[in-house]
Amino acid sequence: NCTTEGGKTIALQITAGYMSYTGGIVGWADGSVTGCTNKQPLSISANRLGDACRYAYAGGVAGKSVGALTGSKNRGNLTATAICKFVIMGGIVGSADGVVSDVVNVAAVSVPGNPDGVNGALKEKYFGPRYAYVGGIAGQLRIDGTLTGNGDTTNSGAVTIEQMEYSTEDIVAVGGVVGQQLGKVSNTVNSGAVTVSASPAAGGTIAWKVRCAG
């Protein structure tokens, strides 16, 4: 059992690192996480030069969970800007290989756009990912992962993708419960809005695939 209190934003600036794992409670969890609550907003951004940052995993509770993650809640908004080529982000967990059950997310999960337009003064700050797996509970549920509950595994936070890198290879997998689902999902509830209004980071016509679930 553990709790992080709100009031400040956990801000991570990634300048180098092929992979990064960021969570309100723990970055990478090999063991079990039980009865934890995160109340801190989480904001991550990265250096997109070359492969300085390729994979960014982020979750309100855990960035990556290999063991069981149960009975936990997230109340802190998650935001990813100028992010790595891959962003895997969820209200509870970025990517899960184990059992995730009886979890609740009430916070927003977003990849925001440039408020000044795609070619505005803040263009570099809002340079989006090429591949986005984003969900209200889990960004990615791996093939050995299980997400379940008795109606008490819920998401009520909005999931929003506003910015992607311009590329014909861009893929957006977004859902109120899970972004990319490879494992088993059962008895989960989503009441949060899911919105994809992505613009290319540079001008021109955007070409990307959208896969929605939940």
Where do the PLM segments sit?
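Predominantly extracellular/luminal carbohydrate-interaction, adhesion, and secreted-enzyme modules
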Residues: 1-214
